[in-house]
From Swiss-Prot:
<keyword id="KW-0028">Amino-acid biosynthesis</keyword>
<keyword id="KW-0057">Aromatic amino acid biosynthesis</keyword>
<keyword id="KW-0413">Isomerase</keyword>
<dbReference type="Pfam" id="PF00697">
    <property type="entry name" value="PRAI"/>
</dbReference>
<keyword id="KW-0822">Tryptophan biosynthesis</keyword>
<protein>
    <recommendedName>
        <fullName>N-(5'-phosphoribosyl)anthranilate isomerase</fullName>
        <ecNumber>5.3.1.24</ecNumber>
    </recommendedName>
</protein>
<comment type="pathway">
    <text>Amino-acid biosynthesis; L-tryptophan biosynthesis; L-tryptophan from chorismate: step 3/5.</text>
</comment>
<dbReference type="InterPro" id="IPR013785">
    <property type="entry name" value="Aldolase_TIM"/>
</dbReference>
<dbReference type="InterPro" id="IPR044643">
    <property type="entry name" value="TrpF_fam"/>
</dbReference>
<dbReference type="InterPro" id="IPR011060">
    <property type="entry name" value="RibuloseP-bd_barrel"/>
</dbReference>
<dbReference type="GO" id="GO:0000162">
    <property type="term" value="P:L-tryptophan biosynthetic process"/>
</dbReference>
<dbReference type="GO" id="GO:0004640">
    <property type="term" value="F:phosphoribosylanthranilate isomerase activity"/>
</dbReference>
<comment type="similarity">
    <text>Belongs to the TrpF family.</text>
</comment>
<dbReference type="InterPro" id="IPR001240">
    <property type="entry name" value="PRAI_dom"/>
</dbReference>
Length: 212
């Protein structure tokens, strides 16, 4: 199972989280986000991490060419799209970045929201399901309706996000079977400031699910 801790802003925390066993670190490249980091920060954080893990850049409604320019200047291995990007947009980005994983995040409000995920099946590598919030794109602390998602089984890998934390992760993964999880606010003291004790507890409770 892929374990992504998103909203990394500090080199020491990034290094510690990678050492604890996370398989991916997420970096927010949306200027309006309280977890926003610049290219220089990403490079400083990733330079401090000796382990081979995924570095995922999170964008929202950015121009594909701008994303391409940022990817060239960083060690980001994946691009996560968290805005209103269309399948056509995703295909265009894939043409520009053929050797990078493209992840499309879907902000789920109701069953119809995740049923519409089918339009992305042929244009991205991975899906991510996050809880809908009218003002925030992510890191809301809101959970999805796990029971309603029980039948969600797309033909490509997917991440579960939305309000996951050490206290609810076992229940979430007992009900659902994603290929990865994405956690941000659930292991924070404040936006961008990770609580390493919470991260360690999360990873401890994930141990029994890691080989699934």
């Amino acid at each position: 199972m892929r374990i992504k801790i998103c909203g990394i802003t500090q080199p020491d925390q990034g290094r510690a989280i990678a050492t604890c066993g996370a398989t991916a670190l997420g970096f927010i490249l949306v200027p309006s986000s309280p977890r926003y980091v610049k290219i220089e920060q990403i490079n400083a954080i990733t330079a401090a991490i000796p382990d081979k893990i995924d570095f995922i850049g999170v964008f929202a409604d950015e121009q594909p060419e701008i994303i391409q320019q940022i990817i060239v200047k960083t060690p980001l291995t994946s691009v996560q799209l968290h805005g209103k990007e269309s399948p056509e947009y995703c295909q265009r980005l894939r043409q520009l970045l053929p050797d990078r994983e493209i992840i499309k995040a879907l902000r789920i409000k109701d069953r119809e929201s995740w049923e519409k995920s089918a339009i992305y099946f042929n244009s991205v590598d991975t899906l991510l399901l996050d809880a809908y919030h009218p003002q925030l794109l992510g890191g809301t602390g809101h959970t999805l309706d796990w029971q309603a998602l029980a039948s969600f089984s797309p033909p490509l890998p997917w991440f579960l996000a939305g309000g996951l934390n050490p206290d609810n992760i076992s229940e979430a993964l007992t009900r659902l079977h994603p290929q990865g999880i994405d956690v941000s606010s659930g292991v924070e003291r404040s936006p961008g400031d990770k609580d390493l004790k919470k991260v360690a507890l999360l990873l401890e409770r994930l141990q029994k699910f890691r080989d699934q």
